Amino acid sequence: MDVIIIIFIVSAAAAAFYLYLVFPTRVSKEQREIFANRCYAHRALYDNKTDRPENSLPAFEAAMRAGYGCELDVQFTKDKKLIVFHDNDFLRSSGVDKKVWELTYDEIKQIKLFESSESVPLFSEVLSTINGREPLIVEIKAEQLTNEWYSELCDATLQMLRGYRGDFCVESFHPVVVRWFKKNAPDVVRGQLVNARRSSPNIDPIIVFPVEQLITGFLTRPHYIAYKEQDRNLALRIVQKLGAMSVMWTVRTQERQNELCKAEDAIIFESYTPAPFFNKHG
């Protein structure tokens, strides 16, 4: 009998400790109404074979006209200008073998995206284009992960968003970025981006595992979890039950969306044109 009691106490303590580690910030009804049941265009509504490449001003304008929210990527240039661009370098987009943080914005704006006439926009230009018409998911790309660099990047992003008249949330793969917003802007809806170990074979599992299992939550207390669509796991389902929203990326077919939207709060999509809103329960 004593052994059973000890096992029960240890199990209860372990469960309580796990819940402490993963417990999210519960999303309010108002926040859920703004961000949930929506489809967000991944890097805007783009076509890299046209003059509407990803994360370009024409792509954002197209998304707004279609009624989509947008997911976008923000990072610093060498001279610490905020730009909207996804990759760490310009090889894929432009054939230029330079890191984003190695070039000033004046140098970057000479680079054309995917053989189009478009160049990389400033974050301020994107915000002006969107002009509060639809909600934004702002991913903060903190690849230069020194304390000074990511703190300045987060602060610059926050200050620009504070002056923006529109709905937005922020997210990052890096828990230190999500924690920065928890400490410095707790009112801003924040999300933890997650890559599972099977999707990140080149990253040390010691780094991936805590984020994948959401046990960095005690540092970040995110409002939502953004998971790669094939990597949904038990940890995500638990955190959903505890009050977090879930966002799935990147969905590429209507059929896959129909499967996912029964369980997910929001969808980040590309390569097809869904309805801007969906009914989570069918």
Residue ranges with predicted function:
Residues M1-G282:
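Phosphate-group recognition and catalysis centered on beta-loop-alpha active-site segments
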